[in-house]
Amino acid sequence: MTAKGNPLTNHQESLRGFPGFLQDVNQHVDRAIAQGMSTRSFVLQIAERYSYIRLADLYRPLRFLRQLSGQPPVCFGASGFRRDLVDDQEPARHYTAFVFVGYWLPTLLATPILWAWEILGFVRYGWQWSQPDIRSGTIGIRHGRCVRKQGPGVLPTLIARDLSEKVGSGPLDNG
């Protein structure tokens, strides 16, 4: 816990890559199911933990936007994530942000938000386009829609299937 008593602001958690992310999501799913937590509450919890989306800060837009583009409370690193989804050291952050967006909005509305966010990033980061972020965000939106329909229990399977670097998936492989 930090001095303010918020366990979510501990940036000192170890970087454990994809396996750590999947394990942490599994633990949150298990806890949500055991406690009878609503899917809505689960999504809010993981969005705050992995992407620093705190709806309580919406009334302070600059702080809210700084949090979105900053380091999340819990960090895992990029190891073990599909390489075509990684453009920085926190791919779980971007992915989870769009799980959040996909949960709340239909794909037809969520996709323009993804593109708008990436266009803003393109300008902010000196004309550097991130196709990995578009891919990751698209997967996140799709997973968010699935969580909305099927509940938190579906998320670990989707993450394992779609975000993990597969053995033998290098650029020289044929399949």
Task: Say what each PLM segment does.
Residues 1-175:
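Intrinsically disordered, low-complexity, mixed-charge
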